[in-house]
Each structure stands twice: as structure tokens, then as C-alpha cells.
A protein has these predicted regions:
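Conserved active-site segments centered on acidic
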Residues: 128-130
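Conserved, well-structured core segments that form or line functional sites
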Residues: 123
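Extended, subdomain-level signal for the structured scaffold at the beginning of enzyme domains
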Residues: 1-119, 132-224
């Protein structure tokens, strides 16, 4: 629950399950980790079983949450400080409503992204998790997104979400902040349309409908 707005927040299921499906179908092993470890909280609107019916058509997530073996993966995660990026081919960060409150100021999350990039790993960031790219800096103090093209949750999507629930959900807007940054190129496509962008080792996805597309770019990059 957001202390600022009182709105329930968490990760967005499709941003986890759809990339998970893409990776495992292509033969990759996937570990799910989190800043603090332990059980993860999902945004209820992203659960296809939720009475709101908002995500009722998300059959990939429905299969995941009804599988005892898969649901365990989000009930007992390792903390990101317990892993080494050198043991992985890529890092994929998912969003939802929560990262604007939980990732934005968390140095551990920023350090994971920078460590992966510095190790020559692919780093993918989707939806509101892209808020970290407003702050994450390389050892030379440059922003990770300096001279890069990237995307994230759009103002048009924030407008829709706020109007849909009748209140402001997020404390700030990624698009507004990104467009104020010098030497970086933030782009968005149509509202809630799949949009994933690759620039070197960095892959970004616009919102929950872009997770699978971002995962496919990761798979493509790993195959090069």
C-alpha cells in the first residue's frame, strides 16, 4: 500500500510471467530475486483471478499462479545482495505500481543494474521499473542512459490509469523526468501498445504489454 496515495501497489504479474514464459520456452533457466528476499506482493489488478476482472484474459499468468511449483518462485525469493551478476547471462527487472516507491531510491537495485552493465551483461528494465534509469549512474558518474534511446511508462498511460481509478497513483511521472534529462533519448509509442527498445546492452519495455517483447530482444541479444 502506498503511504502517499493509499493505493495498493505491487509488481505486475504479466511483466513477470510473460518474460518467464519466453525465457523458459527458449531453454533458459530463470531465478526470481528481489531487493529484500522473501515473498513478493503483486498488484491485485494484475491477477486474472481478481474480482475486478481487469486481467482476466491473461492466461499465461493464470497458468503460472495455479501451478504450485511456479507460485513457490515468488513466495521465497533470494535477496539481490545474495547473487552475483557474473552467474547470469542477463538481468530482467519488472515493474508494476510498486517500483516507483521501492526501486527508485534503492541503491541495491541501482547497483545491480550497473554491475550487470559493467560486466557486459544484458540488462532489461520494463514499465515503472525504468524509474531507476533516472538515477542509476556508471562509475564515471554518467547516467546509464546517457546517449541511449530508451522507453518507459508513458504520460498517456499514467493519465489513463489515474482516470480509471479516480486518483493519482504515482508520485511522479517517468516520461516527464526523462525528458528533462540531458543527453538521452526517451521515446514512447501508442498507449498500452507493445514497445521494446534495445540500445547496446540496455533493453527497455514501455509497460505491461511490452514484457514479452523485451524478453524476445534479450533472447535475440544473447544469441548474437
Amino acid at each position: 500500500m502506498s503511504g502517499q496515495t493509499g493505493w495498493p501497489i505491487g509488481f505486475w504479474w504479466a511483466e513477470l510471467t510473460h518474460p518467464y514464459w519466453e525465457f523458459t520456452e527458449h531453454g533458459y533457466d530463470v531465478d526470481i530475486v528481489s531487493p529484500d528476499g522473501g515473498s513478493l506482493s503483486a498488484d491485485p489488478w494484475s491477477d486474472p483471478r481478481d474480482e475486478s476482472g481487469y486481467s482476466a484474459s491473461d492466461l499465461i499468468t493464470l497458468g503460472f499462479v495455479n501451478s504450485p511449483d511456479h507460485i513457490k518462485l515468488v513466495e521465497d525469493t533470494r535477496a539481490i545482495t545474495e547473487i552475483s551478476v557474473h552467474d547470469y547471462d542477463a538481468v530482467f527487472m519488472i515493474g508494476g505500481q510498486a517500483p516507483m516507491y521501492t526501486f527508485y531510491q534503492d541503491k541495491r537495485v541501482h547497483d545491480l543494474a550497473i554491475s550487470a552493465h559493467e560486466a557486459g551483461k544484458i540488462i532489461a528494465v520494463v514499465c515503472h521499473a525504468t524509474c531507476i534509469l533516472l538515477k542509476a549512474r556508471l562509475p564515471n558518474s554518467d547516467l546509464l542512459v546517457k546517449d541511449k534511446t530508451w522507453t518507459g511508462f508513458a504520460n498517456s498511460e499514467e493519465d489513463y490509469a489515474d482516470a480509471f481509478v479516480g486518483q493519482q497513483i504515482q508520485p511522479f511521472r517517468i516520461e516527464d523526468e526523462a525528458r528533462d534529462l540531458p543527453d538521452t533519448n526517451f521515446i514512447v509509442h501508442g498507449r498500452f501498445r507493445p514497445n521494446a527498445v534495445r540500445h547496446g546492452l540496455l533493453i527497455t519495455g514501455q509497460q505491461q504489454y511490452s514484457g514479452a517483447a523485451a524478453a524476445r530482444l534479450v533472447i535475440q541479444a544473447l544469441g548474437q
